UniProtKB/Swiss-Prot annotation:
Family: Belongs to the tropomyosin family.
Disordered: annotated span: 103-136
Encoding gene per record: TM
Protein name: Tropomyosin Tod p 1.0102
Quaternary structure and partners: Homodimer.
Expression sites by tissue: Expressed in mantle muscle (at protein level).
Disulfide bonding pattern of the chain: none
Length: 284
C-alpha cells in the first residue's frame, strides 16, 4: 500500500511539473504571436513606404523627364522589393500554419495529461475504497472467530451439563432400586432431567447449525478477500499504466518545447531579414 501511495504522489508531482511546462509553452506561443503582430505592423509600414515611393516616382516622372534612366532603375528595385515582400508574406503564412499545428499538438497533450490525472485520481479513490472494505472484512472475521469460540464454549458447557445429567440419572436409577418409597420424587426428578436433556439436545442442534453457518460465512469472507486482493492488483496495474502515460506526455511536452525553440529561431531569422530589407529600402 505504501508503495502505491508513493507512486501516486510521484505521479501527481510529475503531473504538476508537466502542467507548469505546458503553461510555459503557452506563454512562448503568445510571445511568438506578439512577434508575428510586430512583423505584420512592420510590413504595413513597408507597404506605406512603398506607396509613398510610388507617389514620389509619379511626381518625379512629371517634373523630371531627364531622370528616366534613374527612374527605371528605381522601378526595377521596387519590383524586387515587391518580390521580397511576397516571399516574406509567404514565409509568414507558413510560420502561422506551423504555429497552429503546434497549438493543436499542445492542446492534445494537455487533454491527454488531464485524462491521465483523472485516471490517477480514480485509482487513488479505488485504492481507498478497497482499504476500507478490507478493514471491514477483517473486523467481521474477528467477530466471527469470537462467535465461533463462544459457540465452542457453549457446546463444551452443554457436554458438561449432559454428563452431569447422565450422572444424576444414574444416581436416580440406583436410588430408585434402593428406595421404592421415593419413587414419586425420583420420577419427578427424572422428568426434570429429561427436560434438561431435551433443552441440551436442542441447544446442541442450534450450535451445530450456527457452526455450519459460521463456516459458510467464513468461506464467503475468504472469497471476498480474494476478490478484493485481485481488484487491488488491478488498481496497482492501472496506476502503473497511468504513470507510463504521464511519462509519455512529458516526452511530448519536451518535444513541443524543442519545436517552439526552433520556431523562435526562425522568427529571429525572419526579423533579421526584415530589418535588413527595411535598411535597404530606407537607403532608397
Amino acid at each position: 500500500m505504501d508503495a502505491i501511495k508513493k507512486k501516486m504522489l510521484a505521479m501527481k508531482m510529475e503531473k504538476e511539473v508537466a502542467t507548469d511546462k505546458a503553461e510555459q509553452t503557452e506563454q512562448s506561443l503568445r510571445d511568438l504571436e506578439a512577434a508575428k503582430n510586430t512583423i505584420e505592423e512592420d510590413l504595413s509600414t513597408l507597404q506605406k513606404k512603398y506607396s509613398n515611393l510610388e507617389n514620389d516616382f509619379d511626381n518625379a516622372k512629371e517634373n523630371l523627364t531627364v531622370a528616366n534612366t534613374n527612374l527605371e532603375a528605381s522601378e526595377k528595385r521596387v519590383n524586387e522589393c515587391e518580390s521580397e515582400i511576397q516571399g516574406l508574406n509567404r514565409r509568414i503564412q507558413l510560420l502561422e500554419e506551423d504555429l497552429e499545428r503546434s497549438e493543436e499538438r499542445l492542446t492534445s497533450a494537455q487533454s491527454k495529461l488531464e485524462d491521465a490525472s483523472k485516471a490517477a485520481d480514480e485509482s487513488e479513490r479505488g485504492r481507498k475504497v478497497l482499504e476500507n472494505r478490507s478493514q471491514g472484512d477483517e473486523e467481521r472475521i474477528d467477530l466471527l472467530e469470537k462467535q465461533l469460540e463462544e459457540a465452542k464454549w457453549i457446546a463444551e458447557d452443554a457436554d458438561r451439563k449432559f454428563d452431569e445429567a447422565a450422572r444424576k440419572l444414574a444416581i436416580t436409577e440406583v436410588d430408585l432400586e434402593r428406595a421404592e418409597a421415593r419413587l414419586e420424587a425420583a420420577e419427578a426428578k427424572i422428568v426434570e432431567l429429561e427436560e434438561e436433556l431435551k433443552v441440551v439436545g436442542n441447544n446442541m442442534k442450534s450450535l451445530e447449525i450456527s457452526e455450519q453457518e459460521a463456516s459458510q460465512r467464513e468461506d464467503s469472507y475468504e472469497e471476498t478477500i480474494r476478490d478484493l486482493t485481485h481488484r487491488l492488483k488491478e488498481a496497482e496495474n492501472r496506476a502503473a499504466e497511468a504513470e507510463r502515460t504521464v511519462s509519455k506526455l512529458q516526452k511530448e511536452v519536451d518535444r513541443l518545447e524543442d519545436e517552439l525553440l526552433a520556431e523562435k529561431e526562425r522568427y529571429k531569422s525572419i526579423s533579421d531579414e526584415l530589418d535588413q530589407t527595411f535598411a535597404e529600402l530606407a537607403g532608397y
